[in-house]
């Protein structure tokens, strides 16, 4: 019997660079409160958000992904032809088909490469990163562009006091490839579909097409349910990720949780028993919740400000719609 050949790749994989794109329009809490009965103080005290970015009408998940990726590629001193895989994590590429990734790959000059989307809500980046690392270790690719990109502002009902101040726009990309030392630990991931309705689109597109004069679909969230799940379950996931990587809490230099809510992240930091001097990402304050883009955007900000250094040991935890989660320990990229 003929034996089917298999491939194998390098085992030592890491983050080579990170690039970010933030839309130019800054939206304050006061502007949000023009549509709801709330205040800047109330929003900030419950979410940690002061300002956020909204994309321009002509911008899309794809266009923002392209801009972020150009920065990541330039920082790594590579070109599009050096990349042999593109994975886009997004929930807001507003076409059923084609996927966002092939559009991005073509714009960047990545020719004839596997390019596909991951739809896992706010944990999408962690899923995409885990898949990319496994693809490289399995020999399917050598250098992969992993992108989180979202244009959430059009999906939000700006009169919905429960979430209109949370979900926003932005994109960030990382290049994943060979590293002299291991730079990406095993991914701990999973889902709880019993709570699928906790973050959802309230009306499906077929129902809307059949009744176009009726209410349009919007993103809805059961905030209390999500808060409880994230605050008390994601600490366990973070510990599992550290255990899988053979890392202890006091060895973590940087904690980059999904930027959903600063109160959730404060509880996670406490539950994980990280060092008092560990750097905790708080990009949410001026960026808001960019879903799949939030972790790489926060990573880029920490490096840009010098709060974190290349090579620092970082714990990433993404969590959100599904309900889904993905976590891993990584080394911060060089640029």
UniProtKB/Swiss-Prot annotation:
Recorded GO CC terms: cytoplasm
GO process annotations (BP): fatty acid biosynthetic process
Family under the similarity heading: Belongs to the thiolase-like superfamily. FabH family.
UniProt KW keywords: Acyltransferase, Cytoplasm, Fatty acid biosynthesis, Fatty acid metabolism, Lipid biosynthesis, Lipid metabolism, Multifunctional enzyme, Transferase
EC number: 2.3.1.301
Main subcellular localisation: cytoplasm
Quaternary structure annotation from Swiss-Prot or TrEMBL: Homodimer.
Pathway assigned in UniProt: Lipid metabolism; fatty acid biosynthesis; Lipid metabolism; mycolic acid biosynthesis
GO MF, one annotated term: 3-oxoacyl-[acyl-carrier-protein] synthase activity
Subcellular localization: Cytoplasm
Domain notes: The last Arg residue of the ACP-binding site is essential for the weak association between ACP/AcpP and FabH.
The organism of origin for this protein: Mycobacterium ulcerans (strain Agy99)
General function of this protein: Catalyzes the condensation reaction of fatty acid synthesis by the addition to an acyl acceptor of two carbons from malonyl-ACP. Catalyzes the first condensation reaction which initiates fatty acid synthesis and may therefore play a role in governing the total rate of fatty acid production. Possesses both acetoacetyl-ACP synthase and acetyl transacylase activities. Its substrate specificity determines the biosynthesis of branched-chain and/or straight-chain of fatty acids.
PANTHER family (alphabetical): 3-OXOACYL-[ACYL-CARRIER-PROTEIN] SYNTHASE (PTHR43091), BETA-KETOACYL-[ACYL-CARRIER-PROTEIN] SYNTHASE III, CHLOROPLASTIC (PTHR43091:SF1)
Protein name per its UniProtKB record: Mycobacterial beta-ketoacyl-[acyl-carrier-protein] synthase III
Active site positions: 122, 258, 289
Annotated stretches, region: ACP-binding: 259-263
Reactions this protein catalyses: malonyl-[ACP] + dodecanoyl-CoA + H(+) = 3-oxotetradecanoyl-[ACP] + CO2 + CoA
């Amino acid at each position: 019997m003929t034996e089917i050949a298999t491939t194998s790749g390098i085992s030592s994989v890491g983050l080579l660079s990170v690039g970010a794109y933030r839309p130019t329009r800054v939206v304050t809490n006061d502007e949000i409160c023009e549509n709801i009965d709330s205040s800047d103080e109330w929003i900030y005290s419950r979410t940690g958000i002061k300002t956020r970015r909204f994309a321009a009408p002509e911008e899309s998940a794809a266009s923002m992904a392209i801009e972020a990726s150009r920065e990541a590629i330039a920082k790594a001193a590579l070109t599009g032809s050096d990349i042999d895989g593109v994975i886009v994590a997004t929930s807001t590429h507003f076409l059923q088909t084609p996927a966002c990734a092939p559009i991005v790959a073509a714009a960047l000059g990545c020719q004839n490469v596997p390019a596909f989307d991951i739809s896992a809500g706010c944990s999408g980046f962690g899923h995409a990163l885990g898949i990319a690392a496994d693809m490289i270790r399995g020999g399917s690719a050598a250098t992969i562009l992993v992108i989180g990109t979202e244009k959430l502002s059009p999906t939000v009902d700006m009169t919905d006091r429960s979430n209109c101040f949370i979900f926003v726009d932005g994109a960030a990309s990382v290049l994943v490839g060979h590293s002299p030392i291991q730079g990406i630990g095993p991914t701990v991931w999973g889902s709880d579909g019993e709570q699928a309705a906790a973050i959802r689109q309230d009306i499906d597109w077929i129902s809307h097409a059949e009744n176009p004069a009726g209410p349009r679909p919007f993103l809805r969230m059961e905030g209390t349910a999500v808060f409880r799940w994230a605050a008390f379950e994601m600490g366990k996931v973070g510990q599992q990720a550290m255990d899988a990587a053979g890392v202890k809490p006091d060895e973590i230099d940087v904690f980059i949780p999904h930027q959903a809510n600063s109160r959730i992240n404060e509880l996670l930091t406490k539950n994980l028993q990280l060092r008092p001097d560990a750097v905790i990402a708080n990009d949410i304050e001026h960026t808001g919740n960019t879903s799949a883009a939030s972790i790489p955007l926060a990573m880029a900000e920490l490096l840009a400000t010098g709060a974190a250094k290349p090579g620092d040991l970082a714990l990433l935890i993404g969590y959100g719609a599904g309900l889904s989660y993905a976590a891993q320990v990584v080394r911060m990229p060089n640029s």
